[in-house]
């Protein structure tokens, strides 16, 4: 059975809100990315800084902020799938989400609805927060809220006589009353096919506006039926469940889809027109946006059809009621902004116009399909956050939006010269009202303040070399040698690009050196310059000094202790002194290594920490000593008096940190944020204790750290009566991590190699909260994974400035880096693909790393990468000087040459021509054309990411699939060659039968063009055939290849003369969507009827149907999942489910395998676009190769599906059950319901579901006591096995880095 | 093993014996045909029976005419059908019309093999060796090739997979117009004299060397 693991978090911002959710003082944005809820704060530099992030168990479909009684903070109403509403507030004590109430509507909706429900409901909140509605298809739920005290008073006035306020409060102390659930027709019997439903402003009772169409019509039957769209305003009496129709409008255009309530009226948005309806319900004006707009509407019509705007349903709007008028901005799917100007005198509309906002700086060049907009905006200035499906979410500053009005005004002025209107609009606040020259005004300005990284929608992926193209860098082996990355195509339109996902940091190598053997190095900076490099070899008891600026010449320092092991090296006293700590004592030198002082210690020193002027060291017996440099002459060591209690404690390590974490407990510093020196120690029983410079024998401790509790707090240390030393904490660090905005973190490194992090609470000083967001497993406790920590010692190093980032490095056989971007949580990544023994800072912001084979490299962080997601992401933009390629669709990697093949699709105007090139009957050249496509192939060299060859297909063609595969060219020799197989189809109108094309290409080496050394490969076309039927999928099968042409699966064989001859075929029910092969077994997915499992045999050629799925999935993608000699299939369908089926001829009800056994179904929160099989890395034991499936999705996330053996599955299942039973789900999102509840639940085995690693990984972050409870339930010695299983999941993609 | 194109053909499935028994189907499509199996006598003719790792070609594949019902997915006789259930265009006979006329009226849809006899011409040996005296008038195919520089210097690690040509040293056949001359045929006394004369002329300054 399998586990589902998300390896890349979603990046598409699908909903954002502006308001105070966690802090009343700071401007905050609440952002939802599928299932990740983040709160960003606006920093002083106008950047978005992440304050909190929670990963929920389900998708956030919609959310709204609601006021909270008695608190300046707002609460959140979250709508999730299955029409569930959670009311959530921020809990300032635990700094987490607190669920206030949960409302489930799905079951009731199913009972009441007469048709099948939509997957996503609509939520709307009353502007006065009296109630909230959830609507789906034809059913409606109204949830009365008790949030607004003023509103309650109004209510009381109205209903006061019948029901006194006090009584009502007693009856229900909560914030909500009972929900009312009903079919929409019970509001009014004519209501049917509702398009939009919104609460309206300015009514004393909750009132809704409904846009609906009782008789469905479209442009095909419009002439017969006419305009059938209707609009109705209904006032609701929630108490008595009565409704009153306030206004009704009929015969509206059929393309209306959205209703926007304004302060004094409503705007109805249609694809081709905008309508204005007054508050009393009279249609007052209409703007024609293009030539398709309806002409049969009886109102004042403004003709803007030359603007050629199409406002499809995916366009979004931003509305804000300003003092004098309404601000309504529409953003269409191509990210053009329009300002809708409405002016009215009383109820009479005086002006209704649509103006395009003049954006000159092409800020939205790479953005398409906006999803959500929020912010604070007025005519002068303002900031908005816009989330896009394609392109980074943008945090924008808008200045002088009024110019958008003014530009139009000038135009009006020339027509009817009427500036009274203008002054009425802007009033006195407008200084230059009477100056008629537009140039004197400040121009409209839109600028980007910050952006949230987005790589969605991911359309296809492949595995290929990106950073490992060059085998050597600076004459040393590439630190990422033989490493493969995942390369995906992302985005739509002009913002489309490639994304490379690195599982390790791939640094820039500035300098590379061959080294003598060294176990540790130090770089001594004198006057801001790298001066001396000190190396030591612990095995040979040797130390050396080299001069960096003199080409690493050995420095003849006579006083320097060369014959012993150096423990620590540091410059002191403003770089005037150099201190060397050897295993035998302390030595103080001046800058030329002349000895000034010496202090010999009898017992061997094992660890030292030097922070000017203090020297802390521990000896082999576990004693601690602190010395201080004499403050006058800086030539003497003075012993620092330790608290007495310290002598009785067993100490394992000690360091000095600067922090203000315990200022609250220090006399005179209660309110100061000044950083203090903290002498910090880890005791034998894993307590962290510390004291300050003026300690007065007072020691503090971090309570709860020994059990790794969720929250640590500072208290005075009491020596325990009994102490059982069982050290597990190896090293701790307390320092600031981040980029521009740094935050304080406590990093704990254990002997087992695990990394735990705690973040300092921003609200309560002296409290630390555990970081639980998507961890990377680096080790395991109780010696469960000794392979991780042996060979090379793991030591954490802190670098305050590594390319601007404050980071922690951890050396070892597998080195790690802990890095934090401002708009993300702390992330742990693997640092390069080589072991790192030691490191030292280098230059201004680099690091020198020494590996186990004595190579030293100066590494710099790749600035093009983004380190804020769970994998390192790099955007690669494919550009040609002359033209843009727009959407990049498919990608394949040609292994023999190391080249990438990418398909592009450009939008062109569709010419409705018949087969002989004549315009079709009814073709109107005056109207705008529909969109057609033109596509082609690009050959990309990953060295420079330049296009080195291209192949353009004809107009209206669309590449559907590209694969590279090993094809047998000669049936006798069976020599295989890697060829590129491309399937495409022609997109034409529905009267013509679909046709497609099959292309077989080879990539050949040619002599590079002069000046372009990367252009040494070219496409060579081997075979091309036009095919009746669209070629949707191509797939390798035992040296031949299968193409899916519409409903026929055809296996073709390459002949010696490079022609591809059909050798076998199989008919599929409707339309082949995807096909995959494993050995000579194949699965072919159908768009309507599930999929078929087929065996292929050659000479005689046969395609034997071995099994079929019994459910009629609408297959999107499928993949094999092979484990322990069994075959499973994973299928994703159009409803965003992921099904696991199995070929089990032994099973009783499988009709000897002909029915594929349905194992389980799993909900994904977004559409899967592509799946690929990858060999699994085996960390423990068995040599048999297993495979995992990788999939990429529309919301920018990538998942992997990992098969498990029976024993690990059972262990995990128990752990998942335990965790789900005992942990309170965040925001009321129940994992089981969100992931497993679907219509297929009863078909599978309910006790053997696909597991969710998001739940399993919570185990890692449980406090030790809770972990032990779970382990005991799972079985004896379960701890080691559980950690092995977890590591096995985590490392399953290491096959990319250790490919050989 | 390649991570980009994982080799899955060696994987052993638990259900393989079942497939062999039920469909006489095994996981390597290019496995050899069983020498013992006789399709008329059935499974008993092979000593390994259903467990035989080699191919047992069913009697249905001895037929020559493709079943028209099977082509439409309607044949109910399955393996017992007296017609052929295989759609292999490699085995189609040559299109008579095309061979005769050089084109076919059914062109894209014609199911018969369209063999372009020009492409089946032999490669011209002389041309491959460097020069064909007949030039364009040669009846054989002249295929332009790029010499592999690695091969020319001595060794090409790619071997057969190399994109460029690896010409072999070949003694021209008797029919070829090219001959390898023996040394004495080339170094005649007449030529020596001529060379000496030219050398002397250069030394004497009669001919200017440019």
Curated annotation (Swiss-Prot), chain A:
Signal peptide: none annotated. It holds the Pfam family Beta-prop_RSE1_1st. The lineage of its organism: Eukaryota, Fungi, Dikarya, Ascomycota, Saccharomycotina. Belongs to the CFT1 family. Keywords: mRNA processing, Nucleus, RNA-binding. The keyword Nucleus applies. The keyword Phosphoprotein does not apply. GO terms for molecular function: RNA binding. This is Protein CFT1. The gene is CFT1. One of its GO terms (cellular component) is nucleus.
Curated annotation (Swiss-Prot), chain B:
SMART domains: ZnF_C3H1 (SM00356). Its main location: nucleus. GO terms for biological process: mRNA processing. It holds the Pfam family zf-CCCH. InterPro entries: CPSF4/Yth1, Znf_CCCH, Znf_CCCH_sf. It comes from the Eukaryota. This is mRNA 3'-end-processing protein YTH1. It comes from Kluyveromyces lactis (strain ATCC 8585 / CBS 2359 / DSM 70799 / NBRC 1267 / NRRL Y-1140 / WM37). The lineage of its organism: Eukaryota, Fungi, Dikarya, Ascomycota, Saccharomycotina.
């Amino acid at each position: 059975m399998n586990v589902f693991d998300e390896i890349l978090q979603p990046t598409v911002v699908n909903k954002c809100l502006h308001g105070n959710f966690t802090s009343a003082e700071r401007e905050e944005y609440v952002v939802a990315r599928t299932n990740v809820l983040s709160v960003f704060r606006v920093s002083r530099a106008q950047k978005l800084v992440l304050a909190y992030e929670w990963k929920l168990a389900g998708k956030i479909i919609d959310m709204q902020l609601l006021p909270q009684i008695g608190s300046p903070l707002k609460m959140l109403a979250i709508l999730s799938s299955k029409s569930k509403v959670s009311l959530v507030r921020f809990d300032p004590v635990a700094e987490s989400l607190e669920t206030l109430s949960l409302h489930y509507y799905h079951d009731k909706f199913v009972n009441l609805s007469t048709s099948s429900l939509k997957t996503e409901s609509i939520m709307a909140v009353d502007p006065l927060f009296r109630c909230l509605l959830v609507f789906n298809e034809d059913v409606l739920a109204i949830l009365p809220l008790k949030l607004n005290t003023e509103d309650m008073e109004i209510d009381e006035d109205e209903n006061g006589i019948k029901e006194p306020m006090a009584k009502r409060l007693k009856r229900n102390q909560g914030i909500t009353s009972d929900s009312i659930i009903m079919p929409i027709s019970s509001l009014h019997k004519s209501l049917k096919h509702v398009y939009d439903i919104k609460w309206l402003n300015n009514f004393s009772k909750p009132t809704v506006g409904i846009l609906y169409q009782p008789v469905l019509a479209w442009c095909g039957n419009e002439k017969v039926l006419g305009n059938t769209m209707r609009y109705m305003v209904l006032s609701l009496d929630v108490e008595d469940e009565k409704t009153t129709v306030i206004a009704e409008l009929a015969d509206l255009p059929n393309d209306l889809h959205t209703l926007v309530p304004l302060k004094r009226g409503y705007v109805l948005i249609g694809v081709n027109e905008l309508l204005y309806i007054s508050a009393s319900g009279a249609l007052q004006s209409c703007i024609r946006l293009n030539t398709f707009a309806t002409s049969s509407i009886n109102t004042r019509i403004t003709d803007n059809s030359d603007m050629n705007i199409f406002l499809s349903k995916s366009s979004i709007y931003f509305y804000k009621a300003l003092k004098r008028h309404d601000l309504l901005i529409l953003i269409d799917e191509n990210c053009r902004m329009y300002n809708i100007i409405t002016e009215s005198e009383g109820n009479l509309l005086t002006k209704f116009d649509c103006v395009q906002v003049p954006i000159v700086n092409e800020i939205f060049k790479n953005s398409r399909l906006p999803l959500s907009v929020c912010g604070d905006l007025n005519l002068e200035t303002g900031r908005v956050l816009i989330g896009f499906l394609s392109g980074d979410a943008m945090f924008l500053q808008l200045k002088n939006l009024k110019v958008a009005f003014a530009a139009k005004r000038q135009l009006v002025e020339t027509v009817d010269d009427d500036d009274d209107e203008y002054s009425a609009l802007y009033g006195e606040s407008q200084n230059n009202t009477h100056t008629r020259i537009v140039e004197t005004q400040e121009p409209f300005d839109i600028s980007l303040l910050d952006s949230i990284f987005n790589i969605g929608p991911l359309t296809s992926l492949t595995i290929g070399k990106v950073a490992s193209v060059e085998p050597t860098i600076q004459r040393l082996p590439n630190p990422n040698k033989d490493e493969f990355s995942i390369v995906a195509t992302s985005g739509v339109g002009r913002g489309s690009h490639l994304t490379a996902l690195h599982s390790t940091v791939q640094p820039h190598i500035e300098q590379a050196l061959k080294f003598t053997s060294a176990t540790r190095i130090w770089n001594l900076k004198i006057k801001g310059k790298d001066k001396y490099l000190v190396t030591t070899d612990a095995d040979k008891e040797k130390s050396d000094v080299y001069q960096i600026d003199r080409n690493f010449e050995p420095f003849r320092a006579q006083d320097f202790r060369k014959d012993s092991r150096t423990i620590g090296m540091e410059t002191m006293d403003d770089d005037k002194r150099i201190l060397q700590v050897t295993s035998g004592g302390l030595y103080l030198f001046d800058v030329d290594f002349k000895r000034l002082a010496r202090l010999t210690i009898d017992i061997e020193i094992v660890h030292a920490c030097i922070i000017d002027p203090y020297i802390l060291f521990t000896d082999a017996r576990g004693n601690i000593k602190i010395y201080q440099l004499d403050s006058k002459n800086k030539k003497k060591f003075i012993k620092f008096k330790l608290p007495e209690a310290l002598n009785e404690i067993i100490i394992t390590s000690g360091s000095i940190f600067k922090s203000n974490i315990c200022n609250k407990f220090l006399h005179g510093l209660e309110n100061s944020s000044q950083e203090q020196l903290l002498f910090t120690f880890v005791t034998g029983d894993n307590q962290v204790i510390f004291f300050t410079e003026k300690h007065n024998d007072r020691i503090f401790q971090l309570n709860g750290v020994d059990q790794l509790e969720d929250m640590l707090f500072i208290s005075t240390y009491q020596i325990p009566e009994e102490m059982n030393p069982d050290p597990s904490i190896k090293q701790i660090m307390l320092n600031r991590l981040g980029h521009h905005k740094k935050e304080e973190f406590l990093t704990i490194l254990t002997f087992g190699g695990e990394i735990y992090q705690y973040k300092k609470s921003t609200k309560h000083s002296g409290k630390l909260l555990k970081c639980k967001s998507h961890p990377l497993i680096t080790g395991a406790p109780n010696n469960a994974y000794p392979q991780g920590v042996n060979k090379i010692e793991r030591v954490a190093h802190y670098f305050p400035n590594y390319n601007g980032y404050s980071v922690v490095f951890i050396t070892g056989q597998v080195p790690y880096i802990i890095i934090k971007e401002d708009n993300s949580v702390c992330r742990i990544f693997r640092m390069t693909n080589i072991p790192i023994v030691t490191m030292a800072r280098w230059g201004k912001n680099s690091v020198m790393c020494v590996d186990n084979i004595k190579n030293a490299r100066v590494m710099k962080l790749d600035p093009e990468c983004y380190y804020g997601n769970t994998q390192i992401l790099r955007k690669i933009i494919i550009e040609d000087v002359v033209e843009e390629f727009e959407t990049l669709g498919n990608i394949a990697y040609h292994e023999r040459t190391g080249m990438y093949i990418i398909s592009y699709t450009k939008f062109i105007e569709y010419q409705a021509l018949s087969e002989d090139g004549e315009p079709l009957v009814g073709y109107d050249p005056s109207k705008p054309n529909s969109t057609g496509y033109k596509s082609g192939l690009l050959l990309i060299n990953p060295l420079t990411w330049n296009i080195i060859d291209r192949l353009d297909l004809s107009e209206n063609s669309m590449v559907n699939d590209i694969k590279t595969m090993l094809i047998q060219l000669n049936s006798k020799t069976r020599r295989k060659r890697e060829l590129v197989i491309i399937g495409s189809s022609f997109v034409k109108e529905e009267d013509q039968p679909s046709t497609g094309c099959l292309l077989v290409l080879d990539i050949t080496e040619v002599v590079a063009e002069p000046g372009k050394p990367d252009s040494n490969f070219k496409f060579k076309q081997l075979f091309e055939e036009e095919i009746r039927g669209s070629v949707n999928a191509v797939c390798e099968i035992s040296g031949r290849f299968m193409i899916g042409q519409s409903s026929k699966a055809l296996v073709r064989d390459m002949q010696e003369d490079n022609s591809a001859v059909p050798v076998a075929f199989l008919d599929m029910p409707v339309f082949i969507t995807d096909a995959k092969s494993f050995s000579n077994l194949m699965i072919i997915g159908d768009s309507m009827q599930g999929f078929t499992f087929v065996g292929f045999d050659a000479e005689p050629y046969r395609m034997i149907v071995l099994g079929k799925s019994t459910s009629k999935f609408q297959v999107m993608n499928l993949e094999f999942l092979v484990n322990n000699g069994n075959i499973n299939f994973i299928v994703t369908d159009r409803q965003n489910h992921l099904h696991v089926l199995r070929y089990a001829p032994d099973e009783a009800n499988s009709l000897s395998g002909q029915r594929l056994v349905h194992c389980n179904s799993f909900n994904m929160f977004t559409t899967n676009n592509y799946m690929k099989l990858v060999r699994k890395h085996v960390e423990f034991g068995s040599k048999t190769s297993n495979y995992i499936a990788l999939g990429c999705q529309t919301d920018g996330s990538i998942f992997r599906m990992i098969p498990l053996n029976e024993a690990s599955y059972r262990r995990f299942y128990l752990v998942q059950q335990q965790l789900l039973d005992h942990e309170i789900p965040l925001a009321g999102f129940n994992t089981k319901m969100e992931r497993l509840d679907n219509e297929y639940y009863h078909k599978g085995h309910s006790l053997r579901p696909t597991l969710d690693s998001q739940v399993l990984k919570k185990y890692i972050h449980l406090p030790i006591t809770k972990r032990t409870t779970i382990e005991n339930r799972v079985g004896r010695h379960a701890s080691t096995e559980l950690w092995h299983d977890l590591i096995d999941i985590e490392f399953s993609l290491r096959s990319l880095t250790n490919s050989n | 093993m390649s991570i980009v194109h994982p080799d899955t053909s060696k994987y052993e499935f638990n259900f393989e014996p079942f497939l062999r028994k039920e469909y006489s189907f095994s996981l390597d499509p290019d496995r050899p045909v069983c020498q013992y199996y006789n399709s008329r006598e059935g499974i008993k003719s092979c000593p390994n029976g259903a467990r035989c790792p080699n191919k047992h070609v069913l009697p249905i594949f001895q037929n020559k005419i493709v079943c028209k019902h099977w082509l439409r997915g309607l044949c109910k006789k399955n393996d017992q059908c007296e017609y052929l259930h295989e759609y292999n265009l490699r085995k189609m006979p040559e299109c008579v019309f095309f061979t005769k006329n050089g084109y076919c009226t059914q062109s894209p849809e014609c199911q018969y093999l369209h063999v372009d006899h020009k492409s089946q011409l032999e490669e011209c040996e002389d041309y491959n060796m460097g020069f064909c005296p007949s030039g364009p008038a040669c009846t054989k195919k002249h295929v332009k090739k790029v010499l592999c520089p690695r091969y020319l210097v001595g060794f090409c690690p790619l071997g057969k997979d190399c994109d460029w040509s690896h010409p072999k040293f070949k003694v021209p056949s008797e029919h070829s117009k090219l001959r390898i001359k023996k040394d004495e045929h080339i170094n005649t006394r007449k030529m020596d004299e001529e060379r000496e004369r030219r050398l002397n002329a250069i030394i004497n300054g009669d001919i200017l060397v440019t």
